Amino acid sequence: VPTENVEAGRAFGCNPLQLLFKVELPLAQLYTQTPLNVPIHVIHGRRPGPVLLVSAAIHGDELNGVEIIRRLLRHSSLNRLNGTLLAVPVVNVFGFIHKTRYLPDRRDLNRSFPGSETGSLGARMAWQFKTQVLDRATHAVDLHTGAIHRANLPQIRADLSNEDTAAMAAAFGVPVVINSVLGEGTLREVAEAQGIPVITYEAGEALRFDESSIRAGVKGVLNIMHHLRMTGPRRTRAPMEPHIARSSSWVRAERDGVFLPLVALGAWLRKGQLIGRISSPFGGEDVTIESPCAGILVGRNNLPLVNEGEALYHIARFEEVREVAQNLEVFTSDIERGPGLTGEPPIA
């Protein structure tokens, strides 16, 4: 990978003992023969330690992670860093340019790992990213949002059978953790297969900035760095103990029509509670939507026009739903009312 030393961190107020490099990982060319690279920020601390990879926009339309990394790189705690931070604001540069989840051939980059040197565009990109970036890491955090028109409550998804991964999930500091299987071809699957603990942070909606989700993400990554002893003493209070979902499921539309949601993300749902309606734009009776179980609403469709079978609500089940709801209220209040960690004005 060709590397270029850029101003030894002065742009980010870095300590002289700290080295910041900007690496350009070459991928491919556009039709115009314009080279396309993935920018990677490499920050070496004052002492040896873990190598933490923080990646975003592996789906090109998931933008909250891009802003999380931008703010992270400006945070003063990096002046006292131990180990190395690898920050990749945009993995899927093709999708990012075109504001889409996918690659030009409609493949999903996060289903293309470990990839190959001679396969499709997605396979080649995955191979490059794995061999040149992921393989250098000891730990990883992958930043995501919901899909287009679908919003996620800030949550961690991780394979909790791995003790190191479970510890990272707890350290991140959001109230909801979903024990998630490792999907075939995902960055998480290939990382865990080679012994790299990795968690996925899911928050917000594609093609939208959400200030609360961004703040929680910045704070969460800093919590991970503290957990790995990459940074000094904590300046904020320790994160609350998260709640692990026993399971989760989607509520789907029973007919086509206009979807009228009646509950917000993070809502505490009771079994049988009215949570939405589907009406016809041409009149007639509404179809009511009831919660099939008690739980917390962790995902929601924000598009009013739905087809039969379309996913509407994602509900996570917990042993102590009341306690989860109370902790979510405290967490949301702290994130929304507290000052931003980088001193920047909030996105309206």
Please describe what each predicted stretch is.
Residues 18, 23-348:
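Structured catalytic-domain cores with a bias toward divalent-metal coordination
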Residues 9:
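The alpha-helix within a helix-turn-helix
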